[in-house]
Amino acid sequence: MNQINALNQSEIRIDWSMSSPGLAPKSWRVFDSSETPANATRTRVEEELKWPAGTAAALNFAFENRLSRTTGWDLNALADTAALQMAAKIFRRGVVTSEESPRTVSGSYAITFSNHADPRSDLQAEAIHILDQSVQRLWGIKAREGDLVLQLSETEKTLETAAKIFAHIADTNKPIQIIGGGILADTAAFAVALAGRSFELIPTTLLAMADACVGGKTGVNFGKHGKNQLGLFAFPSRVIIHSAWLKTLPTREIKAGLAESYKHAVISRDKSFSRTLAELEPTAEAIKPWLHRIISVKAEIIQIDPNEAGLRAILNFGHTLAHALETISQTHNPSDPLLHGEAISIGMRFATYLSFTEGYLKASEHEHLQTELKSAKFMISNPEFHTHLGPVNNLWPQISACIFQDKKNVGSAKTTEWVLLKDFGEFVQTGSLYTVAVHEDHIKKSWETFAAQESLLQS
C-alpha cells in the first residue's frame, strides 16, 4: 500500500506487476482426445471473436467438470490445442496450460479526479465512445459516427455482446473510451482487451467508480455457469472520476454503490468511516467528499495483489452469496432483478453471520456489524428484496447450485471458499489465501437459520 498517495486528491496512481496467468497450478487436469471436440464447426460467436472452433465447447467442458483457477490444463496428449488454449486464456480470467509458461507483466495507470465543470468535457473528440444509452439520453450526448451506444443489463453481459463490441472496433485504431456503469465497463473492457487494444474508463455510477473500474477485472457471465466466469485481467490506461455523473443516477443505484463502498470501509478497519457510509444520504453531494477515500481502499489492495493471488480476495467479502442471489433473481425476475450492490448488502450480512457461526468472529463484533448493516441507509428492505428476487420457492438448492460454481473454489466438491472475518476489518487467512473452505452442511444450516431470523424466506 506504500505507493498510493492518499493526500493527492486529484489523482491516485496504481503501479502493478503480476504473473500471467495469475495462479500457479496446485493440480493438473490431463486432457485426452476423447474430451475435445472433433471437427467442430465454428459458432457465430467464435467467428466474430476470431476464436478457434471448439472454444465454447472447451469452456463448457471445464465448467461442467468444475475445474478451478488453480487447476492447470495438461494438453500434451493432444495434437490440436488451439481451442483449449483460447479457452484457458479466459476461463475464470486465465489458467495455466502445459504449453504456456507464466510470465510477469507490469504497468501503471492513473485514477484521475476530474475538475471540469461539466463531466462531458472528459470525453475526447478523437476517441471512439462506447457509451451507455441511459447516460447518453440523460446527458444529451450526441453519438457520432464510429461511436457505439448500448443499453446493457446483466442479461446482456454475455459473449455475444462482447463479440458485437469486438467487431465494432476491429477496423479502427482510434483511442477508446468506455462511458457507463459496471456492466458496460466489464463487458466492453473485456472485448477491447480481447482485441489487444488499450482503453480509458469513465464510470458514471457509484458502483463502477468504487469497484468495477478499479482493478483490471473484465469479463462476462456464462449462462448457467454463473456470473463473471469468463474474462481477462486488463488494466485501463486511465480512469476518470467525476462525481457529477451521480446527479442523474437513481437513488436505488446510489444505495447499491454505497453498499459496495461500505465493504471498503470495513476493509479499511476504520469504524468511524463505516459508520459514516452507513449513515450517508444517497445523494451525489453527500458522497462527493468521500469518493477519493472509497476508491483509495481498493486501489491500495490492487497494487499489492493485482491478480487475486492472495490479499485481493478480501474485496469479495459478501460476494459469494451475492452472486448466487443475483443469478437467481435474474432467472425469476429478469425485468427487475436485484442490483449487484443490493445483493452485496445481504451477502455481507450473511458472511458476517457465517464468520460468527464458524467460530472466527466474536459475538460483540458480529452484533456490531449486523446492527450497523441492518440500519444502514443503503440496506435493501425485506419487501424490496422479495420483490426483486422474484417468486422463488425452496431457495437453498438454487443458492447451493450457484455457490459451487464460484471462481474462488479450489478444493473439495463438498466445500466452497468464503471470505470471512475474524475481527472488524481483519479477515481469516489460511496460508497465503484469504478464503476459508466451509462445508456445504455448515453453509446450509447457517443460511437457513440466518434467513429465518432475518425474515428473508418467502412464506
Regions found by a protein language model. Give the residues of each.
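Active-site segments that bind and position negatively charged phosphate/pyrophosphate groups
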Residues: R275, E279-P397
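ATP/NTP phosphate-donor binding region
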Residues: I4-W16, S20-D32, P37, L49-W51, ...
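Structural motif
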Residues: I178-I179, I202
